Amino acid sequence: MGNQMSVPQRVEDQENEPEAETYQDNASALNGVPVVVSTHTVQHLEEVDLGISVKTDNVATSSPETTEISAVADANGKNLGKEAKPEAPAAKSRFFLMLSRPVPGRTGDQAADSSLGSVKLDVSSNKAPANKDPSESWTLPVAAGPGQDTDKTPGHAPAQDKVLSAARDPTLLPPETGGAGGEAPSKPKDSSFFDKFFKLDKGQEKVPGDSQQEAKRAEHQDKVDEVPGLSGQSDDVPAGKDIVDGKEKEGQELGTADCSVPGDPEGLETAKDDSQAAAIAENNNSIMSFFKTLVSPNKAETKKDPEDTGAEKSPTTSADLKSDKANFTSQETQGAGKNSKGCNPSGHTQSVTTPEPAKEGTKEKSGPTSLPLGKLFWKKSVKEDSVPTGAEENVVCESPVEIIKSKEVESALQTVDLNEGDAAPEPTEAKLKREESKPRTSLMAFLRQMSVKGDGGITHSEEINGKDSSCQTSDSTEKTITPPEPEPTGAPQKGKEGSSKDKKSAAEMNKQKSNKQEAKEPAQCTEQATVDTNSLQNGDKLQKRPEKRQQSLGGFFKGLGPKRMLDAQVQTDPVSIGPVGKSK
């Protein structure tokens, strides 16, 4: 605290002062403890206890320093006592209390604060240097006066003592401050300045009321005893920490003097302000991070989608597709309706293959635009994903039958891509994938539903055209494809050639779907024509995508395994036949 800092200054000040006074001060310091008690008893019985507690605190800090402080305080107190004769002992006693918190520089102010001193024991010790400077510099006492007049408002003699001590102290303190006093006060000034600054900001309104309360609390020994205890602790603080502690404790101790709470409220207010500022910053950061997380997951998942068939894909895509569903539906209803009525296998390949590029586009689009909605739908989609596929179909797709059939066709095409490459082992792999992808199946099935809808899949267009039409179209595709079922053996051979071409044609359809205008019947023919050129470019991407779809749909068609394979083989031939024939 400022105590140790002020104590050496006091010693130097005492040396600067007449030695007779220092002797008297020392004598009063030695006798000061009992004398202070008596003075307090004379003026304020309540302050007597304060004086005792302060003495105990002073003794706890360091008897020599306390004696020196008391000597200085007594000298100042005596000087104050000379001018404020009746109240001088009170000033001394209060000074002593103040001295317990090194008040030597603030003698004048402390005299005024002595009333507050009982309450503001720690405050006086911390502010002692701050007020000390005012008392030392004539003009500052005036400044200190108004600052502490609020504390002195109770009208105790300390106000007069402060004025007299301010008048006296300029004479007494100049020699005292002549040495290190001038330097140390500057530090207290800084501390007191910051303290007053923050207090004026936060405690101006509190200070007058607190000063009145302090006057009352000075009358209450319990509260005063608590304050001296704080002051004693502040006295115990090392000199190195005096200034910093003075700043912190002045804020806290003044609060404790005010009620040991008001200061804390100030500290709490500061802490609250800081916490609020931090909370605002954190909120901003959290908001930014929230958007970042919303944006980055979508983007990251768009990257992951071609690689991972995990559930991450489903939530974002489902949310994105939901947000962008309206955009796709209106356009895709036109193109998809035509596609579903055109070459069904190629149309199915469109609906199957297009979803992922469209998903990526929708992710990028809806990611930034529909971040909060994406998050909400993301969570909802996850929840819906946990729902059985049938329920998902009911929820997401108005006609689950349409989706099932269309997905059977889709799965057939997808399995065609891999079956063409994998030939026979696909059934077993599909079963294993079904079992493994059970958790993912619902998610992927949900994605399929959303992708079929959002990307203008046959199901969505057929839903618009009518549930019956969807059932008919899907059934017609399956039935029309069924005749070549006896050709499964030749399918792998053609499939290998046709798979790449199917994928290529699917890629073509993806591009045309993105254009959303070329997805018409003539577009399908042109797609098959341009399959060869695009096959090299889009073949690889499509190879990965059908694998994902297989896994996702594999779990979805657990009960449809044999049917799924039949559809795959059945669709393989017609789908592959077109491009294969052209390639031939």
Curated annotation (Swiss-Prot):
Main location, first listed in the record: cytoplasm
Chain spans, region Interacts with DYNLL1 and DYNLL2: 565-584
Biased composition (Basic and acidic residues): 186-226, 238-252, 300-311, 357-366, 428-439, 494-506, 541-550
Any one Gene Ontology cellular component term annotated for this protein: cytoplasm
InterPro entries: NABC1 (IPR026115)
Region spans: Disordered: 1-29, 59-280, 297-377, 415-584
Highest taxon in the source lineage: Eukaryota
Residue(s) carrying Phosphothreonine: 480
Keywords of this entry: Cytoplasm, Phosphoprotein
Residues where Phosphoserine is found: 124, 192, 314, 381, 399, 552
Localization per record: Cytoplasm
Biological process according to GO: myelination
Tissue specificity: Highly expressed in the brain and, more specifically, in oligodendrocytes (at protein level). Expressed in the prostate, and at lower levels in testis, intestine and colon. Overexpressed in most breast cancer cell lines and down-regulated in some colorectal tumors.
Residue ranges, compositional bias (Polar residues): 59-69, 112-128, 314-354, 525-540
Subunit (UniProt): Homodimer. Interacts with DYNLL1 and DYNLL2.
Role summary: Required for myelination.
Protein name (Swiss-Prot/TrEMBL): Breast carcinoma-amplified sequence 1
Source organism of the structure: Homo sapiens (Human)
